[in-house]
């Protein structure tokens, strides 16, 4: 059923991202991220977004597993579809911001790691294939199998992504920040506007660094 995903369904690891990178990552490990002098609201927001996707995936898996346990239920099916639509839409928008805003900024600051970000970009495409497999599943069992693949793929991706990006950004003084402009070139805010990162396609994000 999932033959078209075989090549990319393996969760990516930090070691995979760094395969063609000669420069070592800064030695800033996960336990100290939030205590680092350069940790700021933007980084907190980005990590919390990943936390939201982890929670949504868990809720979706539980909902699919329980679906139909007490017989057909139209309301239950509608709730499940709403959960899935919300998850897929928010994830797609989040990845667009990463690919179009976050990643280019970090690559510009650390060009030695460009190949690692190319791998992350490609892995976003592999995640899309996993999402399609969930939607194209023929029955509940197939959907659950596809969700498990998606779960492993996305969790691995976010962990590797965080372990790559956080040390690079935390090493970058001053703390990484963004100025946000509307389509007329007017400054409309800073990192706080990223709370609504997916609300308005007309906004332009420019790093202060």
Feature map (PLM): residue ranges:
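Small-residue-biased structural context
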Residues: 1-209
